[in-house]
C-alpha cells in the first residue's frame, strides 16, 4: 500500500505537456491512408487521427469558451426561427409533392394515435425527478429527495396538474399540507426554462434548457409512457445496441442507410406535433412544456415545441422519426429493419431519398457529415463500422496530464480496433512511451474502460479508488424535510435505499483483486514473450 505522500506525488505528476497532444503528433508522423470513409484507401487510424482531438477544448483552431457558447445560442435561435416560420407558413413543398407529403403524414398520424392509446389513463404513472440542475435547484442540491422536500418550481399552465400529481401520493400530499398549507402556495411559479450550454466540441457548445422542477417531473412521466409504447414496436430507447448492430450490418452489404440530423430536438415545430399527435395528448404536452425563456433580460417565446433538457423531448423526437420512417416504408412497400434512437435513424437504402425529402419538408436538417447512405461506412449511436470492422474513435475531451488521464489514454489505445485479440502494432510505440510514465504498481489490470490502473500483461498490482462519502439514514441525520423527501422518493423508486453520495478529488489505493481475463495484446508484446 502506498503511503499518502507517495500517492499524492504520483497523482500530481507535472508532465509539462498534454499527452493528448503528444498522441496526436505521433499519429501525424505516421504514413497513413485517407481519413475519408468513402475513399478507396480509407485508413481507420487516419480517421482516429482526425477525430480524437475534435472535442479537446483548447487545441488547433478551437474557439474560446465564450465564442462556443455564443455560437450554440445562435444555432438554437436559428432552429427556433425556422420553427416559427413553419408554424405560420406550413411545410416546405419545394422538394416533395404536397399530395405525397400529406399521405405520409396521415399514415404517420394514424401510427402515433395507435401507439399512444391509453395515454390519458397512465400519464402520471411514471413521473419522477431527475438528478440534474433545474430552475429551482443548483446541481449540488439537485438530488430528487431535495426537490421533493423543497418548494419546487412550476409554470402557471402546469400548476394544477402538479398539484394533482402530489395528491396521488398520500405522504407527499400530507407533507405539502403540513409545510406549505394551502395548495396555492405549494410551488413557486416561474415564467419558463433557463438557457445554458454544455461542451460539445472545440468549435461549438450544445445549447439546452433547465426546466422548472414540477414541469420536469410531469414531462418525465409522459416521456416514460412514450418510451414504453415504442418498445412494443421494436424501438427500445433503453438500449443503443440494436442501432449499433444495424450499423454493422449496413457496413457489410450497404443495404441500410444511417441518417443523423442536425439540432433535431430543437427543430420540432409546434405545427408538426399538432398534426401528428392526438388532440388530448398534444394539449397535455403543451401544458407541461415551457413556452418561454429569458434571453439577455428579455422574455422569449419559443417557436419550437420543446428543447433539449425537456423530460419528454428525446422520446417525442424518437416517436416522430419512427412514425415518419415507418409510414414511408409502408407507402413504398419496403420491408426490412428500422432502427430509431433519438435522431439516429436507420432505414433500408431504398427509403433514404424519400425520407430525406420528408424530413427537410417538416423542418429537419440532415447532418451530412454523419449521414451515410452509400459505400460501406456506417455510424449510429456512437458505433462506427467499415466493412464489419469496428472503427469507433476515442476522443480526448480534456488535457491528458494526470495519472488517471494517462492510464485511460493508454487503455483506449490498447483497445482501439482490435482484431482477433490483437491491438494495432502501429500504436505500440506511443503506448509504451506513455506506459513508461506510470508507476509499475498500477500495471496489470484488464478493464479497458478504467482510468484507475494500466491494462497490461503484467501481474495485477494496485488500483486507484476515488474517495467518496455516502450518506444514508443509518450514518447521517437528515433534516426533517429531507427525511420526508427521501421517503417520498423511495415510494417512487419502489425499492432500494435513498442515498446521497459526495465525491471528492482525492484517491486511495487498494489491491487489484479483479478476476484475470484475456486482454488485447500488441504483436510486439508477443514477440517479447517468445524471446524471453
Curated annotation (Swiss-Prot):
Q: Which UniProt keywords apply?
A: Nucleotide-binding, Nucleotidyltransferase, RNA-directed RNA polymerase, Transferase, Viral RNA replication
Enzyme Commission code: 2.7.7.48
Report which superkingdom the organism of origin falls in. Viruses
Instruction: Report which reactions are catalysed by this protein.
Output: RNA(n) + a ribonucleoside 5'-triphosphate = RNA(n+1) + diphosphate
Q: Does the keyword Nucleotide-binding apply?
A: yes
The RdRp catalytic domain, residue ranges: 245-375
**GO terms, biological process:** viral RNA genome replication
Output the Gene Ontology terms for molecular function: nucleotide binding; RNA-directed RNA polymerase activity
Query: According to its UniProt record, what is one Pfam family this protein matches?
Result: RNA_replicase_B
InterPro entries in the cross-refs: DNA/RNA_pol_sf (IPR043502), RNA-dir_Rpol_cat_phage (IPR007096), RNArep_beta (IPR005093)
The job of this chain, per UniProt, is described as:
This is the catalytic subunit of the viral RNA-dependent RNA polymerase complex. This complex is involved in viral RNA replication that produces (+)-stranded genomes via a complementary, (-)-stranded intermediate.
Q: How does it assemble?
A: Part of the viral RNA-dependent RNA polymerase complex, the other subunits are probably the host ribosomal protein S1, EF-Tu and EF-Ts.
* Protein name per its UniProtKB record: RNA-directed RNA polymerase beta chain
What organism is listed for this UniProt entry?
Answer: Enterobacteria phage GA
Amino acid at each position: 500500500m502506498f503511503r499518502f505522500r507517495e500517492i499524492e506525488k504520483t497523482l500530481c505528476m507535472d508532465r509539462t505537456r498534454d499527452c493528448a497532444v503528444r498522441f496526436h503528433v505521433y499519429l501525424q508522423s505516421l504514413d497513413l491512408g485517407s481519413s475519408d470513409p468513402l475513399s478507396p484507401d480509407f485508413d481507420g487510424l487516419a480517421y482516429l487521427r482526425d477525430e480524437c482531438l475534435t472535442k479537446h477544448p483548447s487545441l488547433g483552431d478551437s474557439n474560446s469558451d465564450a465564442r462556443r457558447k455564443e455560437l450554440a445560442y445562435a444555432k438554437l435561435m436559428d432552429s427556433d426561427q425556422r420553427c416559427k416560420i413553419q408554424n405560420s407558413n406550413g411545410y416546405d413543398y419545394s422538394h416533395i409533392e404536397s399530395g405525397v407529403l400529406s399521405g405520409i403524414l396521415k399514415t404517420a398520424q394514424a401510427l402515433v394515435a395507435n401507439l399512444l392509446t391509453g395515454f390519458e389513463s397512465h400519464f402520471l404513472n411514471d413521473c419522477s425527478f431527475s438528478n440534474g440542475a433545474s430552475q429551482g435547484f443548483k446541481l449540488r442540491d439537485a438530488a430528487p429527495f431535495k426537490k421533493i422536500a423543497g418548494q419546487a418550481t412550476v409554470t402557471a399552465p402546469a400548476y394544477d396538474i402538479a398539484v394533482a400529481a402530489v395528491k396521488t401520493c398520500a405522504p407527499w400530499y400530507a407533507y405539502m399540507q403540513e409545510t406549505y398549507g394551502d395548495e396555492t402556495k405549494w410551488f413557486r411559479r416561474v415564467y419558463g426554462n433557463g438557457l445554458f450550454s454544455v461542451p460539445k466540441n472545440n468549435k461549438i457548445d450544445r445549447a439546452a434548457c433547465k426546466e422548472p422542477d414540477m414541469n420536469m417531473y410531469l414531462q418525465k412521466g409522459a416521456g416514460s409512457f412514450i418510451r414504453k409504447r415504442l418498445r412494443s414496436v421494436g424501438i427500445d430507447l433503453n438500449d443503443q445496441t440494436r442501432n449499433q448492430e444495424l450499423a454493422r450490418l449496413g457496413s457489410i452489404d450497404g443495404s441500410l442507410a444511417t441518417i443523423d440530423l442536425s439540432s433535431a430536438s430543437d427543430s420540432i415545430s409546434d405545427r408538426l406535433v399538432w398534426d401528428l399527435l392526438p388532440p388530448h395528448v398534444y394539449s397535455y404536452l403543451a401544458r407541461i412544456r415551457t413556452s418561454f425563456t429569458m434571453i439577455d433580460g428579455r422574455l422569449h417565446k419559443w417557436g419550437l415545441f420543446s428543447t433539449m433538457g425537456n423530460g419528454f423531448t428525446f422520446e417525442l423526437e424518437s416517436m416522430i422519426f419512427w412514425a415518419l420512417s415507418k409510414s414511408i416504408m409502408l407507402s413504398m412497400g419496403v420491408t426490412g429493419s428500422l432502427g430509431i434512437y433519438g435522431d439516429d435513424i436507420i432505414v433500408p437504402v431504398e427509403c433514404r431519398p424519400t425520407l430525406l425529402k420528408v424530413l427537410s419538408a417538416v423542418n429537419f436538417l440532415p447532418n451530412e457529415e454523419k449521414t451515410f447512405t452509400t459505400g460501406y461506412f456506417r455510424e449510429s449511436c456512437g458505433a462506427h463500422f467499415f466493412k464489419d470492422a469496428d472503427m469507433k474513435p476515442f476522443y480526448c475531451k480534456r488535457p491528458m496530464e494526470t495519472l488517471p488521464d494517462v492510464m485511460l489514454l493508454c487503455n483506449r489505445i490498447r483497445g482501439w480496433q482490435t482484431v482477433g485479440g490483437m491491438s494495432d502494432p502501429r500504436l505500440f510505440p506511443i503506448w509504451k512511451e506513455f506506459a513508461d510514465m506510470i508507476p509499475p504498481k498500477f500495471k496489470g489490470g484488464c478493464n479497458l474502460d478504467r482510468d484507475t490502473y494500466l491494462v497490461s500483461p503484467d501481474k495485477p498490482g494496485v488500483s486507484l479508488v476515488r474517495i467518496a462519502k455516502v450518506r444514508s439514514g443509518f450514518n447521517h441525520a437528515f433534516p426533517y424535510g429531507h427525511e420526508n423527501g427521501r421517503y417520498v422518493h423511495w415510494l417512487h423508486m419502489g425499492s432500494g435505499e435513498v442515498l446521497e453520495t459526495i465525491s471528492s478529488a482525492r484517491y486511495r489505493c487498494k489491491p487489484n483483486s479483479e478476476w484475470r481475463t484475456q486482454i488485447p495484446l500488441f504483436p510486439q508484446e508477443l514477440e517479447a514473450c517468445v524471446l524471453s
